[in-house]
Regions:
Chain A
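N-terminal intrinsically disordered/low-complexity leader segments
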Residues: 1-31, 192-205
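Helix-turn-helix
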Residues: 35, 39-77, 81
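Amphipathic alpha-helical interaction segments
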Residues: 35, 77, 106, 138, ...
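Hydrophobic alpha-helical connector segments
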Residues: 92-138, 164
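C-terminal all-alpha effector/ligand-binding and dimerization domain
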Residues: 209-228
Length: 228, 228
């Protein structure tokens, strides 16, 4: 199934050509979707997705914009390449080889971890059509097949996946929240219950993980019950 | 509890002063946090939060930047006003007056609906400290008190709220997703299971609501069981 894929491979190499330029004889690294994806992720990581422009991307790749347009026709295509590459890093390896709950657990944690590193892409991926995003479609196919085999009602499989993803995207943001996000400042006296709960919650060393595990296990348990 | 609050009221009036300007005698509407909040939300809705600048906000309010700085010291303050105002629109009215499951259900649906109208603020609210955001703190206090009264383990109350919020924020994006988000494009043949599940799911008229209900009820059911 993988052989025909030409983009979104798991580990795009760094843009070697940029550092291998030889004096007097410019070395033109072959421009392909892997290089475009790497450069786009680099720019998005630095400037957010609003900071990604076709002109900026061409400059980063040291090519003329026209060369870039031979591979991607618009920023939307570039975002889809970036999104599809990130999805290729999500672990779906246990689906079909372990009970679906266990596979879904590994999938969801790795999905959250990948997007916690790229939260600026969440507003994009959450609403970007998957058309021509082969790794993303493959992930959906793998998860769907496993959910169907487990006995999920057919008409609720896509909704279940979306519910997982919504929780995963929101939780990815939470990973990046500052430690003091719940500090109450000057209005502290009016929130005695909240303050007490915050204090009690300090036993959880990694609060984002505690909240994620709680919600994820809730989703898995409820879906497991719906199969009975 | 509400009397001392001076910002983030539930319904900020439109900036009347701007249309009541009288010829030859400029009418200066009183600049307060309510007007600043309205103007900020208007700009954010139009340009996203990256498009909000202190200079642009002063211009929108027809005041000198120095006048603006008398009320807010930085863009971060403005975002907090906007965030706190949105939170004031979330329905917490049933907490303490109905079973916690029912109150949480109304709270979560209204919370999702408010942020589905303002998804560009999600990356902000998800990581913005609540210091000096009185409506936000009041919401947390109300929910915490109800969860504690229901018998939630004290050390897991904040994590439970965060799990709900993560799901709510991710689901707010899903409300804005285009209908064709899962269209497979040219690679359609490699995803037979996913295509079949998509087709079966078309019985759900409002897919974002189906997914939200599924996940929300899962969270509520699992948390309810943890109380037994």
């Amino acid at each position: 199934m993988h052989a025909s894929r030409t983009c979104g491979t798991r580990t795009p190499p760094a843009s070697e050509g940029l550092s291998r330029r030889r004096a007097g004889r410019p070395f033109a690294a072959i421009l392909d979707k892997t290089r475009i994806t790497s450069a786009a992720l680099e720019i998005i990581g630095r400037k957010g997705y609003d900071g990604l422009t076709m002109a900026g991307l061409a400059k980063q790749l040291e090519v003329a914009p026209s060369a870039l347009y031979n591979h991607v026709t618009a920023k939307r295509d570039v975002l889809q390449l970036a999104e599809d590459h990130l999805i290729s890093m999500v672990d779906v390896s246990l689906f079909g080889r372990a009970p679906w709950e266990e596979a879904a657990r590994i999938w969801a944690w790795s999905y959250r971890d990948v997007f916690a590193q790229h939260t600026s892409l969440i507003p994009v991926i959450a609403v970007l059509p998957v058309t021509n995003a082969p790794q993303t479609l493959e992930m959906y196919e793998t998860v769907t097949r496993a959910f169907a085999a487990a006995g999920f009602p057919q008409n609720l499989i896509v909704s279940s996946i979306v519910a997982f993803e919504s929780f995963i995207f929101g939780s990815a943001y939470d990973v990046t929240a500052p430690d003091d996000i719940f500090e109450a400042g000057s209005t502290v006296d009016s929130t005695p219950h909240f303050r007490a709960a915050l204090k009690a919650g300090r036993v959880n060393e990694r609060p984002a993980d505690t909240a994620f595990e709680l919600g994820l296990e809730a989703l898995i348990a409820a879906l497991a019950r719906s199969l009975c």
